Structure formats: structure tokens, C-alpha cells
């Protein structure tokens, strides 16, 4: 088996990349998130989250006016999903827990939903029984609506204690079997698109002509999405306070896990960040080089610098000034080193050029304009990469290698997982089932990016695993069901029947591992097993 330092792969043929090119303990997996796949919005005692409220109150912000009420019904079809994962033969499955499914009121005093606990116990037990490691995210943007109504969710420091209470419940109920935890998924996306652009729940922010002229970097949102016309919120302050409280909640949960659970449960805990590679538009321009570095600071450094040094990046202090919150000495100490591993989610890259200073008055301050950069998709008419199904996602495989090396060198991170990486295509209802399963663009995307992950490892980055996004076609936030990210095709017209795409078959053939059943600790109320997976759903 190849070792991290010795593997040699054909630099001209990413199609031949396989498990043999990676260390024996390298983890290959795929992922999902609760709101995007579960459905069952009103089933089993689940309480509403801010995404339930947002999609119902502002259907104009979602393509087709759709929502995640049913999603792809994994709440009821999770056994099929486990069987699909078994057939794929990968090592791990990354999923998130719906905070309001286990705590409908957001905290213990509002009651623990035993049906929600049982659902996740059954999912975890099913994964382990088939040799699949669960990687669990605690927060994937779905704040319980009860806490949003009570004090504004992550706008308030009160969220820190409630998040810790929720995390402790999860550690206690599931930590005997879950050995890899992530506190937060893409807190950047939650802060910026929830509180600056207003495109995501809870839909706070403000759009002015200046913000339109200097848009934020596109990540998981279309440039042709509806402009947020709400008047609530302050995009020049709220994203920074929300991030401040996210970071404090993360650090407090990590401290709790390390002090009370890690020794007995022998697990690890980390955080997953949104990333893009920022390429200077003019590599010979000092201002563009500086702008690219600043763009990385405002996206990745905003979160990485506090958990490595205990403070925000210097560039953010300079350009945001007094609107950037400050950590107390105690908070800085708690933040510094608050991770066992770091997850990076990578999809695309941008060209970056320096932008002029905001001079239109304090009323127009926004995260978008604070960065003082302009994002470009092309250089002299040549795109940075081919277009995918979404206008924000241009394919640039070299970027994943560059961002991994950058993260290692800049923050000296000892252990990294690629926790999301994938590409979408447009949902085309005119395709036959056979045609819809031929996803050549995704297949090439995965091959090229996994190849570049291996190259980053050769560069000295300790990458311990890779998770393709996503297992299933699903509810893709502002895009609704208009695009497909899954390696498994969902037939929305046939009770969410699941069919493997070519990319899934390639992953199975290239990264299948001979797995043995691992004993699952069955602490849950088991469901009846009479419901069998239909052969139709699993035919290849």
C-alpha cells in the first residue's frame, strides 16, 4: 500500500487515481446535510428551524418556490441510503443532525425529542453495522426557530450556552459510536448569506447599488438569484457579530467535549470551512496579489486565524475597524487550538483584483464592500475554468491543491479533511433515466480533484480523508431542486427512487474497500425491519 510520502502517480492521467494511491488509513466518503435530504419536517416531533420559516415566508428566494419539507425523504428512507453506502464500499458518511429534531425548543428545558434521538441512533447503528464510519456535523445552518424568535439566534451571545447544551446531548447520546465530530459547517456561508446578502435563512441584510457593484464572492448562491429586498439587519455589523458568536459556540463545544467526553469516547472534534482559491487577476500587480490574500483572509482567515492564534486577521482589523468584535483574553485562550482537525469544503476559484475604498458613507458599510476586492470569473476573456450547472461554480481542480497547501503553510494545521467537494449539473426533465445517470462532467471533476488532493499530500499536507458532495441529489438551498449535486440520481416523480450515476460506479470501483461488519452499540428503540428496499430503487 502506498504511503503518504512515497506514492507516485501519473501526472498526466487523473482517470487512473484509485485507493492504491493513498495511505491505508485514508478515508474516502460522501456526505449530506439534514435539511437538504431528510424531509419529515413535521414528523416525529421535529420542531421548525429558520430554514422552514425562510422557505415558507420567502418562497421568492428559492428557485421554483420549493422547500425542504419532504426533500428526498431520507427521514423515512434512511435504510435505503445506508444500503447504497454499503454498496459503494466507501469508508465513511458525513451527515448533520437537525438541532430542532432532537431539541424542538432549542434547549433541554423545551424537552428532548426521543423520536429524533432514535432516528439518529438507528442511522448510526446502520452505518456501523455495515462498516461505515459516521462523521457528524452539529450545525449546518438550521437554527431552531424557537431560539431565533426568543433572542435572534446567533445574533445573541445567549446562543453559546444553548449550542453547548445541544452539543452535550449529542455527545452523550451518540458519542459512544461517533468518533469524528464537526461543530459547524461553513460558518462563513451562514454569516454572509444569512446576514449580509440576505439570500439564505434568516434572510437578513440589505442590498444597495454599491453592494450590487461589489458583490461578495459567489459560493452556493447564484449571481442571478433574487436580490434581498428586506430592510431588516445591518450587513456592516451583523455578519461580524454572528461569526463572533459562532466561533465562541464552536470553542465552548470543543472545550466541553475535550473536558467531559474525549477521554472516555476517544473521538476527535473539528470544524469545516467554506473555501475558494483566490487567484490574483494580474500576478504582476502588487495590489492584486494583496487583494487575493485579503479575500482569503475575509473568507477562510476570518475563522482559521481565531482558532489558531486567538484573534482575527490583521487585514480585517484594518478594513472593518471598530465594527469588528474583540475577543477577551479568556475567549482568545479558549479559541486557540480548539480543534483536532480542520475540514475544508472546496468547489471553485475566482480571479481577484483590488477595488477602490468605500467612500459613500457609513450607512453603506457591508461585509461585501469591506473586503475592497472585485471577483472575476475570467482573465482577458478566458474563464478560470469550465462552467458547471451553477453560474457560481467554475471548475478549477488546481485550486483544491493550492488551498490545501495554503492552509497548511499559513495556519500550520496538522490534520485536514476535504469535507466537501463536488459539482452540479442542471436538472433536465427531458432526459431519460439512462441519460440522467451519465454524469461525465462530475466524473471528471471528481477524478481531477482527488488527483490534486493526492498532489497536495505529496507537497506535505496531511490530508486524512476526502468526502464527495453529495451522496444524493437534494434541496440545494437557493437553487431549490433546480440543480443536482448527487452521485446518486433521485427520481422526484417516482417516490424519490434512487439510482447510481456513473460517478458513483467509478467511486465504487476505484475506492471500494473490503469492509467487515463493526459491532454497533444498540442503545435505541429499534424499528421493525419489515420494510424492504425495493429492487427498483437499487438496480444499476
Swiss-Prot record:
A beta-D-glucoside binds at residues 36, 140, 185-186, 347, 420, 469, 476-477, 485. GO terms for biological process: alkaloid biosynthetic process; carbohydrate metabolic process. Keywords: Alkaloid metabolism, Disulfide bond, Glycosidase, Hydrolase, Transferase. Disulfide bonds join 221-230. Changing residue 485 to Y: Reduced activity. Its EC number is 3.2.1.125, 2.4.1.219. It holds the Pfam family Glyco_hydro_1. The record marks 390 as: Directs the conformation of W-392. The record marks 392 as: Controls the gate shape and acceptance of substrates. SUPFAM superfamilies: (Trans)glycosidases. The active site is at 186 (proton donor), 420 (nucleophile). InterPro entries: Glyco_hydro_1, Glyco_hydro_1_N_CS, Glycoside_hydrolase_SF. It catalyses: raucaffricine + H2O = vomilenine + D-glucose; vomilenine + UDP-alpha-D-glucose = raucaffricine + UDP + H(+). GO terms for molecular function: raucaffricine beta-glucosidase activity; vomilenine glucosyltransferase activity. Glucosidase specifically involved in alkaloid biosynthesis leading to the accumulation of several alkaloids, including ajmaline, an important plant-derived pharmaceutical used in the treatment of heart disorders. Belongs to the glycosyl hydrolase 1 family. This is Raucaffricine-O-beta-D-glucosidase. It comes from Rauvolfia serpentina. The gene is RG.
Amino acid at each position: 500500500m502506498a504511503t503518504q510520502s512515497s506514492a507516485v502517480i501519473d501526472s498526466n492521467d487523473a482517470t487512473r487515481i484509485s485507493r492504491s494511491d493513498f495511505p491505508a488509513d485514508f478515508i474516502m466518503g460522501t456526505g449530506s446535510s439534514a435539511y437538504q435530504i431528510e424531509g419529515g419536517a413535521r414528523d416525529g416531533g421535529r420542531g421548525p428551524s429558520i430554514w422552514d420559516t425562510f422557505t415558507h415566508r420567502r418562497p421568492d428566494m428559492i428557485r421554483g418556490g420549493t422547500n425542504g419539507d419532504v426533500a428526498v425523504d431520507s427521514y423515512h428512507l434512511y435504510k435505503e441510503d445506508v444500503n447504497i453506502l454499503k454498496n459503494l464500499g466507501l469508508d465513511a458518511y458525513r451527515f448533520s443532525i437537525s438541532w430542532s429534531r432532537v431539541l424542538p425548543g432549542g434547549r433541554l428545558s423545551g424537552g428532548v425529542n426521543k423520536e429524533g434521538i432514535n432516528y439518529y441512533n438507528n442511522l448510526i447503528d446502520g452505518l456501523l453495522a455495515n462498516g461505515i464510519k459516521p462523521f457528524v456535523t452539529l450545525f449546518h445552518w438550521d437554527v431552531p426557530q424557537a431560539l431565533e424568535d426568543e433572542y435572534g439566534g446567533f445574533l445573541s451571545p445567549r446562543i453559546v450556552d444553548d449550542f453547548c447544551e445541544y452539543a452535550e446531548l449529542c455527545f452523550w447520546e451518540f458519542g459512544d459510536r461517533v468518533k469524528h465530530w464537526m461543530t459547524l459547517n461553513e460558518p462563513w456561508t451562514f454569516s454572509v448569506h444569512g446576514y449580509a446578502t440576505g439570500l439564505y435563512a434568516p434572510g437578513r441584510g440589505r442590498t444597495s447599488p454599491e453592494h450590487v457593484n461589489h458583490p461578495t464572492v459567489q459560493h452556493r448562491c447564484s449571481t442571478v438569484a433574487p436580490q434581498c429586498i428586506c430592510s431588516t439587519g445591518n450587513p456592516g455589523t451583523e455578519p461580524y457579530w454572528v461569526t463572533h458568536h459562532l466561533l465562541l459556540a464552536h470553542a465552548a463545544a470543543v472545550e466541553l467535549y475535550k473536558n467531559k467526553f474525549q477521554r472516555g469516547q476517544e473521538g476527535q472534534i473539528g470544524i469545516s470551512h467554506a473555501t475558494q482559491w483566490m487567484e490574483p487577476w494580474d500576478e504582476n500587480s502588487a495590489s492584486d496579489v494583496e487583494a487575493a490574500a485579503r479575500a482569503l483572509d475575509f473568507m477562510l482567515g476570518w475563522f482559521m486565524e481565531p482558532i489558531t492564534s486567538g484573534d482575527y486577521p490583521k487585514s480585517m482589523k484594518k478594513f472593518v475597524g471598530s465594527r469588528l468584535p474583540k475577543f477577551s483574553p479568556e475567549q482568545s485562550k479558549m479559541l486557540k487550538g480548539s480543534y483536532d482537525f480542520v475540514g475544508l469544503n472546496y468547489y471553485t476559484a475566482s480571479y481577484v483584483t483590488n477595488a477602490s475604498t468605500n467612500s459613500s458613507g457609513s450607512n453603506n458599510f457591508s461585509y461585501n464592500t469591506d473586503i475592497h476586492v472585485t471577483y472575476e470569473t475570467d482573465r482577458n476573456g478566458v474563464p478560470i475554468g469550465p462552467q458547471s450547472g451553477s453560474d457560481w461554480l467554475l471548475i478549477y481542480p488546481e485550486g483544491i491543491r493550492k488551498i490545501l497547501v495554503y492552509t497548511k503553510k499559513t495556519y500550520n494545521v496538522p490534520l485536514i479533511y476535504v469535507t466537501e467537494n463536488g459539482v452540479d449539473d442542471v436538472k433536465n426533465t427531458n432526459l431519460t433515466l439512462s441519460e440522467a445517470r451519465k454524469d461525465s462532467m462530475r466524473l471528471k471533476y471528481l477524478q481531477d480533484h482527488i488527483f490534486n488532493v493526492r498532489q497536495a499530500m505529496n507537497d506535505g499536507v496531511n490530508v486524512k480523508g476526502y468526502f464527495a458532495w453529495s451522496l444524493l441529489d437534494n434541496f440545494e438551498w437557493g437553487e431549490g431542486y433546480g440543480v443536482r449535486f448527487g452521485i446518486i440520481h433521485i427520481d422526484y416523480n417516482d417516490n424519490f427512487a434512487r439510482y447510481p450515476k456513473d460517478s458513483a460506479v467509478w467511486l465504487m470501483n476505484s475506492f471500494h474497500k473490503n469492509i467487515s461488519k463493526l459491532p454497533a452499540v444498540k442503545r435505541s428503540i429499534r424499528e421493525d425491519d419489515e420494510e424492504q428496499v425495493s429492487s427498483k430503487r437499487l438496480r444499476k
